[in-house]
């Protein structure tokens, strides 16, 4: 969903930066007993899109920047993509075994592939429209991927690739469910799309908060209503995750009322056919990103948002405060005991014990 203007580009600059390493010990009760926070690097940067690629944490950022942090070598590398005098903001990132893909949010939308081998950058998709605003991107496999954007007509803007990201095609509106007036998506943490096998879930916000489901990699769709708060421009589902094909969790709330903890989180046990509110007036208010803990049997969830980092060990009913730092926008797990969080001016490693 549009919140600021963007600028676009292409010129590559390789940079390395000094690593910062600050540690904080936070004791708490639950499935884990303690957590340490290691600051991997700090910079003047806004990061809402990250992914884990073996020993590297790749990121897309503001001011035409992307890069990675090598967890083994403890080194950061960063590049810029410039086009004319404009800049890009990358809020969507995805990968295949060979390439990283970065998608900018606003007009014109530019999608780049970046070779993991030599970091060569290639423009693979461009869309010009005053209403264009892309929110999230994922791959089903090494050949097929999908990205979702706000409606430019009366449906979500959905582009797909079937050739490993070499070419992308926008799905025709008559093949997609119609969005309600004022229904769009939020580019908060690259978690508007969740994929498990061939199953795909997209989440919406604004005047409506719904889940769009495809069982066949975006060929057909069904839409499900949810009880998440909705009705205003900045309400709805901001983030989603599925533990498996049946257990899922959605969260969000009201961005303008970030302390409101009601009607902002819900779960499913049937693959998204039905959703039930949970944790009413408990835990967090506005949620930017939620992720299931690997190996937690769908019971353990971590959230980053307006009240910091919080953890649930009972499926979202109760929440424990892990950190009061509110500057994180997104989080991904490396394994059960390690996660990476990023946001305003920093990237950190969370070590759960």
Question: What does each model-found stretch correspond to?
Answer:
Residues 39-64:
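Beta-strand-rich domains and repeat architectures in extracellular enzymes and scaffolds
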Residues 56-58, 99-101, 143-147, 199-201, ...:
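Entry beta-strands of beta-propeller and related beta-repeat scaffolds
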Residues 27-40, 63-83, 108-128, 158-177, ...:
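Asp-box/BNR beta-propeller loop motif
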Residues 333-353:
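Blade-level signature of beta-propeller repeat domains, shared across WD40, Kelch, NHL, RCC1
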Residues 46-49, 88-94, 131-138, 234-239, ...:
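Repeated scaffold domains used in trafficking and secretory/extracellular systems
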């Amino acid at each position: 969903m549009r919140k600021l203007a963007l600028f676009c580009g292409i010129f590559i600059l390789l940079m390395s930066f000094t690593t910062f390493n600050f540690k904080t010990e936070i004791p708490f009760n639950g499935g884990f007993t303690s957590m340490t926070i290691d600051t991997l690097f700090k910079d003047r940067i806004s990061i809402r899109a990250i992914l884990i690629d073996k020993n590297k944490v790749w990121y897309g950022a503001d001011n035409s920047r992307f890069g990675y942090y090598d967890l083994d070598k403890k080194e950061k590398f960063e590049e810029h993509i410039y086009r004319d005098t404009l800049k890009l903001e990358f809020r969507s990132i995805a990968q295949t075994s060979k390439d990283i893909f970065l998608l900018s949010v606003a007009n014109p939308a530019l999608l780049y592939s970046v070779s993991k081998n030599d970091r060569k950058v290639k423009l693979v998709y461009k869309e010009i429209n005053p209403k264009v605003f892309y929110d999230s991107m994922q791959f089903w496999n090494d050949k097929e991927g999908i990205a979702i954007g706000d409606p430019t007509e009366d449906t979500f803007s959905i582009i797909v690739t079937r050739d490993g990201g070499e070419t992308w095609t926008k799905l025709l509106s008559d093949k997609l469910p119609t969005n309600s007036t004022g229904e769009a998506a939020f580019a908060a943490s690259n978690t508007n799309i969740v994929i498990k096998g061939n199953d795909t879930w997209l989440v919406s916000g604004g005047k409506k908060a719904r889940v769009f489901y495809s069982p066949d990699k975006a060929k057909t769709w069904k839409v499900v209503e949810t009880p998440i708060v909705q009705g205003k421009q900045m309400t709805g589902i901001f983030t989603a995750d599925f533990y498996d094909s049946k257990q899922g969790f959605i969260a969000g709330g009201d961005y303008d009322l970030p302390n409101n903890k009601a009607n902002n989180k819900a779960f499913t046990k049937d693959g998204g056919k039905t959703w039930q509110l949970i944790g009413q007036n408990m835990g967090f208010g506005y949620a930017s990103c939620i992720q299931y803990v690997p190996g937690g049997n769908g019971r353990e969830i971590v959230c980053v948002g307006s009240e910091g980092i919080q953890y649930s060990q009972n499926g979202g009913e109760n929440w424990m405060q892990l950190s009061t730092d509110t500057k994180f926008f997104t989080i991904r797990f490396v394994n059960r005991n390690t996660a990476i969080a990023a946001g305003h001016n920093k990237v950190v490693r969370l070590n759960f014990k």
